[in-house]
Amino acid sequence: AAVVNRLSQGAVTQDFTDIDTIERGLREATDDIALALDEKELGVGTTVTGAALSMLDGEPFWTVFNVGDSRVYLYEHNELIQVTIDHSVVQELVDAGVIRAEDAESHPDSNVITRAVGFNMDAIPDYWVVPVRRGLRLLICSDGLTKEVNREELRLHLAAGRSAQQTAVELIGAALAAGGRDNITAIVVDVVESTGIGESDNTIPRTGPTPTRG
């Protein structure tokens, strides 16, 4: 709640959100969490991910950001792309070639994250820039969804042509039906109109501070 409150306070004062606003919100949320907890709970933190509408060189883009293992996916032309990279022990094992990506979810350390908002320390987000294109869908979700619903199932739900709200409801229902072992969040965002800006750019460049792996 602290993260949502702080990020929304910055977003409602302007049409577009920049990286400075996101990072200020995360710093303030970290302070809020520290004030709300007693000394025994100072190790408590939360993950955060999202997509903020931003301006880059006069053009609208999504600024995608994450801290932890919640994710943002892009669905377009029947293809599902994971935009964010988890800050987790198992992701580091995958990157190092120790385990396969398909084995990460069942690994005993799958719930151990290497970055979070809280812990009485600065949150360090990673950033990506995604062009705003008509027909594009974004899925913003917690690991409570992705641990229960595999990648192909996610793609099929997003491809079904239902409204953003109905798709999110059905994704949560699928996660609950599969066991629902963790908190489940799913938000689907559709781009229904576009000015044509960014229509020819199919890349997802990373921007902002050079990311570090915890």
Annotate the PLM regions.
Residues 1-214:
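PP2C/PPM-type serine/threonine phosphatase catalytic domain
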